[in-house]
Regions:
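Short loop/edge segments at beta-strand edges and connector loops
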Residues: 94, 114, 210
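Residue-level detector of anion-binding/catalytic polar loops
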Residues: 43, 109, 188
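Short, surface-exposed loop/turn motifs that are enriched in glycine and acidic residues
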Residues: 86, 110, 141-142
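N-terminal helical cap/lid subdomain that shapes the substrate entry/recognition surface
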Residues: 9-106, 119
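Asp-based, Mg2+/Mn2+-dependent phosphohydrolase catalytic module
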Residues: 3-12, 101-104, 118, 122-224
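A generic alpha-helix signature
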Residues: 28, 74, 114-116, 147-150
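Hydrophobic residues in well-ordered beta-strands that form the structural core
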Residues: 24, 46, 112-114, 191
């Protein structure tokens, strides 16, 4: 997509998805799905399908695989155990770490908006040395009703409570879940092309940045 008038906008706060946007976490997430399904003696989908579960809420993913009721709850619980073994392993995509710090130093309010649970998101950002770049680290709750939209609402509310300008927020993400969540929350979406989006997953984003430098040009305040 062409930048068009979107390039002229100034965003008062920026929310970032984590998996597929900040960190390259597909191998760990897909591995946790394989281990979980194997533990229960269930069929393991091929990699192409597993990759579509990098980013969505767990309750959706296991439901999409055809599981419901107590079995789905048990799968979600076991997945979280398996994921805990390796969730600190993924590294940031090239250039993302520097961009986050540069935005922070430029005074741009930053928050995560991730479908992983908040304690894990905090621990991961601390492990990567990025926790202090964010004003707010917001993630999901164990509640099946927790969604990307609810996380975005929470991130914006917490930023606002700190005194940040949240009049023109934007979310940066790599999947259809970020697009849907952002639009359901009433904010624009910047898609990134280095994550795990399906072919048409970012079609409804206001703009797609194929590189970190494209994203930098869009987000950095003038004169920085």
């Amino acid at each position: 997509q062409e930048p068009g008038d979107f390039m002229s906008l100034t965003f008062s706060a920026v929310l970032f998805d984590v998996d597929g946007t900040i960190v390259n976490s597909a191998p760990v997430i897909m591995g946790a799905f394989r281990s979980t399904l194997s533990d229960f003696g269930l069929e393991i989908p091929d990699d192409q399908r597993l990759r579509t579960y990098v980013g969505p809420p767990l309750w959706y993913s296991f439901g999409d695989l055809g599981y419901s009721g107590q079995l789905r709850a048990d799968l979600v619980s076991r997945y979280r155990e398996r994921y805990m073994d390796h969730y600190l392993d993924p590294e940031p995509f090239d250039g993302v770490r520097d961009l986050l710090w540069d935005l922070h130093h430029a005074g741009v309010p930053l928050a995560t908006a991730t479908s992983k649970q908040t304690p894990m998101a905090i621990a991961q950002m601390e492990h990567l040395g990025l926790a202090d770049a964010f004003d707010v680290i917001a993630g999901a709750t164990p509640d099946p009703g927790s969604s990307k939209t609810t996380v975005i609402h929470e991130a914006i509310a917490r930023l606002g409570a700190m005194g940040a300008d949240v009049s023109h927020p934007v979310i940066v993400g790599d999947s259809i879940w970020d697009v849907r969540g952002g639009h359901e929350a009433g904010i624009p979406v910047i898609g990134v092309g280095w994550g795990y989006a399906t072919e048409d997953g970012l079609d409804d984003a206001e703009i797609v940045c194929e590189t970190v430098e494209d994203l930098r040009a869009l987000l950095m305040p003038a004169g920085c």
